[in-house]
Amino acid sequence: MRKHKIGIYEKALPKNISWQDRLSIAKACGFDFVEISIDETDERLARLDWTKKERIKLAKAIISTGITIPSMCLSAHRRFPFGSRDETTRQKAYEVMEKAIQLAVDLGIRTIQIAGYDVYYEEQDEGTIARFQQGMEWAVALAASNQVTLAVEIMDTKFMSSISRWKKWDELIRSPWFTVYPDLGNLSAWNDNVAEELKLGIDKISAIHLKDTYKVTETCQGQFRDVPFGEGCVDFAQCFKTLAALNYRGAF
């Protein structure tokens, strides 16, 4: 029996199939779990309004296949950020968060990975950061009351580009229900000291994403998607050695 649970992101599986089939494929491929996506598309946002019957159907598929959905990648806040200048957009951000937590409760999802963006399609300023903080404080309080963990992804933008940067938010929010969900690709693209970053956050890492990236330099903006494993900047062997030395026992 391996020490770590190994999961697959929903978007790595066929799109237009049932959840029963999706979980069955993951099982046949040797994965332990699937991470569900609630992104900024209307199609996946609609999952937040699934009926009781639809939720029960997925719960039954989880039980019948033995493949769990312990985590949700909630990237919808890229479209509806807490830090937005637009009040309607901010209201939608709160609504999305509330519905996502309820969906997590219903499906047994323990960790919601949230995007570390104060804003994405707007310019950042002190106001966007302040509103993001208000949103995070509210969201973590709601998640905590439902025993759901909110884990911030290390992102493809500088605002949340390292565990060091996330740590400043951890010191502000100060909750066991507010953790970090590093992506080794994003972390490596922005930072030369990946081992030190992992050491800094080891006590609050909920899970880890694995992908390769091209590094951000003075002459290159980096590439955060669609980089074949082994062709990018991530030193996977060294990352795994560091995590083993830190006694990391979470999922990948």
Where are these regions (language model features)?
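Active-site acidic/histidine proton-transfer and metal-coordination neighborhood
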Residues: 20-21, 27, 61-65, 80-180
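Conserved, mostly hydrophobic/aromatic
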Residues: 8, 26, 34, 62, ...
